[in-house]
Structure formats: C-alpha cells, structure tokens
Regions:
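Active-site nucleotide/adenylate-binding loops and adjacent lid/helix of ATP-dependent enzymes
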Residues: 1-6, 102-184, 191, 243-246
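ATP-binding N-terminal substructure of ATP-dependent carboxylate-amine bond-forming enzymes
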Residues: 1-94, 100, 129-136, 318-321
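Short beta-strand segments
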Residues: 11-13, 147, 186
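Anion (oxyanion) recognition and catalysis
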Residues: 42, 88, 116, 177, ...
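Hydrophobic beta-strand scaffold residues
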Residues: 48, 93-94, 122, 144, ...
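Conserved metal-phosphate-binding beta-hairpin within the catalytic cores
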Residues: 87, 187, 197-198, 253-288, ...
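Phosphate-binding site of ATP-dependent enzymes
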Residues: 164-247, 270, 274-276
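Active-site "cap" helix and flanking loop/linker of ATP-utilizing ligase/carboxylase catalytic domains
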Residues: 211-262, 294-329
C-alpha cells in the first residue's frame, strides 16, 4: 500500500514484506515478484507499508492514500475482486478497475459472453461444475482445451489440457472439479499465444505484442511455465493485424473502461490469419522480465516509469472517490 509520510509506525497488523521471514510455498516466483514491486514503489519515493490484512487500511486513521494490491491468491472464493470491492466500501483509491469490471475479467466464461456481445472473435466455450455435471455429448466440435474458469497464473493447465475427444475432456475436467474448481472447456485454437498489454488513459495505449515462450505441445502456456517462467517472453510482429487488434481494444475500452492497465490474451494462427481472444487480465504482472515491461522498454520506458504512470492515472481515475465517508462506522 502506498501511504502518506509517517504512517509506518502505527498501521495495524503490518506484515514483513520479506517473504523469507514468512515463506509462501507453491507460488513459484510470485513472492519474489511481490517483494520486488514493494521495493520498486518505495524507490519511487512513496511511503509504503506491506500488509496481508485488508482491514489494516481501516485502522490507518485516514493516513493511507492508495492501495496497490497484489493480493489475488488467497483462501476464499473469487479473491481477485475482494480488494477492489473492499476499497469501494471504505472509499479509498485502489489499483485496477471497479469490482464489477474485475468480476467480468476474472470469470473467463463471463468474459467470453461479454466479448461475444461486442462482436469480438472468441472460441466456443462451456462452463462445467460439480453441480451441473459434464454433458454426455460434446456441445461443439473439437479439439478442446480444458482449464479453470477462475484463477490466475494458468492454474491447472497441463499438457493434457489439449483434448482430442470429449472422452478426454471428461477425464481432464473431472480432475479439476475433484480439486474443487469450476471448469471452462473451449474449442482449442491453433497458433500461438500473443498478449497485448494496454495502459489506461484518455484513450487506451497499446504497448506492443508479446509472445510467452513455450516448449509444450501446441505452444500452450502451462501452470509450471507461468509460475517459474524459465523461458520468458519475446516481442512478436502481428503482421497486418495491428489495426484489427486496436479496434478490439477500443471496443473493450468503450464497454469496460476506464481501467488502470490490462492485457488482452489472444491465440493467433499466423498461417490462416485467424485471431481469437482467450481472456482479459487486470492487475497483471508488472515484473521487469514480464510482458508489460518488455513491451514498454521498446518505447524507452522502464518499470519505474510504468509504476509512476499507472499509480498517477489510477489516482486520477478515482479522484471523485471520497475517502472514509462519514457514514462509515
């Protein structure tokens, strides 16, 4: 959290940002990334306090100006939208987008429905859960791709997420449902993943086109690749699709903006020229080695420049959000 000068001495339930003192297992490189962002915001000149307790802000006696949330992987259903909802309740500016927009982005099936209503090209898909069960017959032609309906970091995606038959879908989907997850089954898209990072502004700013590297079948991005990121990213040319992608981004911004920053993840088959949107990510990775910083560097901007811009734009976006309304207890 970025806060006013002198707030560090009394903020309730502060946690040491050094994860070596309080280790978090099973999260790959994310704890280190979170710590690096904490330090980067400090280095800009903000007074920053780290806390894993959202209610710390309420005990800060009005001395917190902004919540820069990295908290989207914790033990509750739909954790990604909690912080934005909570900050709206206590009326303090926060990173990302309003909670209703976060909810659209975090529910990959809902994203698909909204994008289809905007006449954007998305693959066919169906949501599955333990309550609904798995249809006996395939609702659309294969091959198929099976993943979690909710969640970040390509959670649950493995090489066998590509399914050539509905029988294989049944097996893969049951594995995820037995782990307690809702499932999204999509029509598998040939090609490669291309992510398009976008900054908020008076008009959305497309930073570039980035391919997450993959050594998996179909060049898919699996959970282990996302968590450990040993292959990294590379800039790619989208050939003659730039104007079409810009049109996609404008449609999304017109319907869902303003947002502080986001990514649109495509699957592009350069042989056929077909592009399909898989999902949208808000409050996504801002690490120096990630897609957003890589794209920004092509324009001469550093991670520090990005953080300064995003925080400043976010504060401006929420300039009418009253802090600590008098009706709050």
């Amino acid at each position: 959290m970025a806060s006013r000068q002198g707030s560090c001495s009394w903020l309730h339930n502060v946690d040491a940002p050094d994860f070596s003192k309080k280790p978090y297992t099973g999260n790959g490189g994310y704890p280190q990334y979170h710590y690096n962002i904490y330090k980067a915001i400090q280095d800009i000149g903000y007074d920053v306090v780290s806390s894993s307790k959202p209610y710390s802000v309420q005990f800060a006696k009005g001395n917190v100006d902004y919540v820069f949330s990295l908290m989207n992987r914790f033990a509750m259903s739909r954790p990604e939208i909690f912080i934005s909802s909570y900050c709206e309740f206590i009326q303090i500016p926060y990173l990302g987008a309003p909670p209703n927009i976060r909810a659209i982005a975090e529910d990959k099936l809902l994203t698909k429905m909204v994008f289809r209503s905007l006449e954007l090209n998305v693959p066919e898909g169906i949501g599955l859960s333990g309550e609904k069960g798995i249809p006996a017959q395939a609702p659309f032609p294969g091959p198929y791709f099976v993943k979690k309906r909710f969640g970040a970091a390509s959670g649950g995606i493995r090489e066998d997420s590509i399914c050539s038959s509905w029988k294989a879908v049944d097996s893969c989907a049951r594995r995820l449902m037995e782990e307690g997850h809702e499932v999204l089954v999509e029509q598998y898209c040939e090609g490669i993943d291309v992510t398009v990072p976008v900054l908020g502004g008076e008009n959305p700013v497309i930073l570039g086109y980035v391919q997450p590297k993959s050594d998996k079948p179909g060049s898919i991005i699996t959970e282990d690749l996302k968590l450990h990121d040993h292959l990294g990213y590379q800039l790619v040319s989208v050939q003659d699709m730039e104007q079409d992608i810009a049109c996609d981004v404008r449609k999304i911004w017109s319907a869902l903006g303003p947002m502080d920053y986001f990514r649109i993840d495509y699957r592009i088959d350069f042989e056929t020229g077909e592009r399909r949107i898989l999902e949208m990510n808000i409050c996504c990775h801002l690490g120096k080695s990630g897609s957003i910083c890589l794209a920004a560097a092509e324009h001469g901007y550093s991670q520090e420049d990005l953080l300064k811009y995003i925080i400043a734009y976010s504060m401006h976006r929420q300039k009418n959000l009253r802090q600590y309304g008098t009706w709050l207890i």
